[in-house]
Amino acid sequence: MSGTHKKLGARHKARKRAVDFLFEAEARDLDPVALASERSDLSVKDDAVAPVAAYTVTLVSGVAENLDRIDQVISSHLQDWTLERLPAVDRAILRIAVWELFHATDVPPVVAVDEAVELAKQLSTDDSPGFVNGILGQVVLVAPQVRSAAAATSQRAQESDSGTE
């Protein structure tokens, strides 16, 4: 029974905080990485500000670095919608989940999708969990190919770097 409550652990909280940062950065037209860094610095000085988990920073940085590609992927799976028409919180949730599906090799795809749906239940409209699940259900089909291509590119870059030393 306690296992069902375990999923709301450190990684879940980190994902929620990343959604908060992406949402706030978009609303205030700020750089999300700078915002997360600022809050992290502030948390050291002010006990009233919650510490920023390393995984939160990883998520925010990953989304920011890959935003155009992530948005292209999400947009390609929207039917009768544009990315701009989605609620901002749904955009943030989808961006994090897509980044995890493509780049977080330590996160099983089912976990990335389940966590995104859970965040949509907590933070968005009644229709959002089903919508988020539907989009990610399509994205998860291409995730293995994207991960393989990214791994091959990374390996080639490492081999190239080691050959130049």
Swiss-Prot record:
Involved in transcription antitermination. Required for transcription of ribosomal RNA (rRNA) genes. Binds specifically to the boxA antiterminator sequence of the ribosomal RNA (rrn) operons. One of its GO terms (molecular function) is RNA binding. It comes from the Bacteria. It comes from Rhodococcus erythropolis (strain PR4 / NBRC 100887). GO terms for cellular component: cytosol. This is Transcription antitermination protein NusB. Gene3D superfamilies: NusB-like. Belongs to the NusB family. One of its GO terms (biological process) is DNA-templated transcription termination. Keywords: RNA-binding, Transcription, Transcription antitermination, Transcription regulation. Coiled coil: none annotated.
